[in-house]
C-alpha cells in the first residue's frame, strides 16, 4: 500500500500536496508515490487528408510533448525537493503515467491508503479538477484534499450525520483515522432535522464502531452553519484532518447556492479533507 500525491506541475500546489502525502504516509509507515498523469499527445490528433495538414499536426504533437516534458520536470522537481531529505524514513518515488488524469486518479485510489489532491482542485480551471471530481463523484472512491497548512499532530474530526457519505468516508479512511489516534465526533443536532433522520445519525453508533477498532473518541457538538463550525472546531482543537461525506445534495446546487462540502472546499484556511461520497 502507499500514499499517492497527484501532481500537476505547479510548484506551490505540488509542494503542499507532497507535504500532506508525506505527513499521512509517516503515520501509516507506507511509501509515497508522486504521480503525474498526462495524456498521449498523439491521442488528440484529428485524421488529416492532406500532406500540409499532416505536417501541421506533427508539429503540434511535438509542441504538446515539449510542454508536457516541462510539466513533468516541474512536478518531479517539487516532489523531489520535499522528499529528498530522507528524514521521514520513507521510500518515495516519482512516476509519469501516460493516461488521462481522471483514469489515473481512479486507478490510484482503488487500493492506495490515500490519494492526495492539491487544495486548488476546487477551481474549475485547475489541471486536476476533473480528475478530483471524477474519482470522488463518478468512481466514488475516497480522496484527500491537501490543507492550506502542513499536517499537525492533532486529532481527526469526523463530521457525522449518519448519511451514506459520512459512513463511507469514515470506513474508507479508517487507516488514516487510526493512524492519527483520536477522533472528535462533530455533529449539529439541529441540522439533522433538514433531512429524514436515520438511527445511525446517533453518535453512539459511530462511537461503538470506533470502539471495535480501538480508536479513542469524544463528542463535540457544533452549532450554526456546519462548514464554518467544523472549520472553527478544527482550528480550536488543532485538528489535522476533517473526515466528511461529500455532496449529500446536488453538486451543481451546492456550487450555485452553497453547501457544506462546497464551503469546506472553498475555505481559504483549513486542514486536510478526507472525503467520500
Question: Across the structure, where does each feature detected by a protein language model lie?
Answer:
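A short acidic, glycine-rich active-site loop
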Residues: 55-73
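A structural preference for short, hydrophobic beta-strand core positions in alpha/beta folds
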Residues: 34, 92-96, 145, 185, ...
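Charged helix-capping and loop-helix junction motifs
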Residues: 129-132, 200-203, 256-261
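Structural beta-alpha unit
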Residues: 13, 39-42, 66, 73, ...
